[in-house]
């Protein structure tokens, strides 16, 4: 089920970000320790404004951790929903122009063994 409410994520380019840094999200997994993150099975991301920014691509790490070319960039259209296993390592690349909005959330199930 959907035990957590979805989140609206905002990433901004450095010229409009109050801290002057590009919005990004470093490599991570959505599943983790604790009662709520351990229940995450499927992660989703819905892109809300793909023509209004540059940079900010959602990337997935494929292959060994030492592989410098092991990430795959995902291109999305307005309103497209991307589903992936919550244990998959992913990131959002730094923004270069504009603001990126996405709705993200997780479907839950029994803990992984």
Annotate each predicted stretch with a short phrase:
Residues 1-113:
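Catalytic core of non-heme Fe(II) oxygenases with the double-stranded beta-helix
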């Amino acid at each position: 089920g959907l035990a957590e409410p979805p989140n609206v994520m905002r990433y901004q380019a450095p010229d409009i970000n109050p801290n002057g840094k590009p919005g990004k999200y470093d490599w991570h997994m959505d599943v983790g320790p604790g009662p709520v993150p351990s229940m995450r099975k499927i992660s989703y991301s819905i892109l809300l404004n793909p023509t209004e920014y540059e940079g900010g691509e959602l990337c997935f790490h494929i292959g060994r951790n030492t592989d410098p070319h092991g990430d795959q960039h995902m291109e999305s259209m307005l309103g497209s929903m991307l589903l992936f296993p919550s244990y998959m390592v992913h990131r959002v690349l730094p923004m270069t122009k504009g603001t990126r909005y996405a709705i993200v959330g997780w479907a839950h199930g029994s803990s992984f063994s």
